[in-house]
Amino acid sequence: MVYLMMDKRGSMNLVKVGRASHIPQRRASYRTHNPLAIMRSNCAGTVKAEKECHEKLNKVGKRVPRSEWWIVSDEVFASLYEKGMGYFFPNHLPIHFCEEF
């Protein structure tokens, strides 16, 4: 599964796409060190799918140095929030929505 994490820190919009075999366990580990971030969406996906998401994030955002997170514009953040993983894979079903701000 690939998943979309989102975090809004003041005026900074942070997003991360990762991959995990056990989504609930991965989300629980995030709550420990980043309790304000939400796991917005997930869908079936491979290492290749995760890489494709990272490539798209490189085009629309700026990677935080030494981090798995990207800073994106308000417009991109809103689109990611609305579409979830569908932002990256518009024809891929099912897209699961997990948490909301």
Regions found by a protein language model. Name each.
Residues M1-F101:
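Non-catalytic accessory segments flanking enzymatic or RNA/DNA-binding domains
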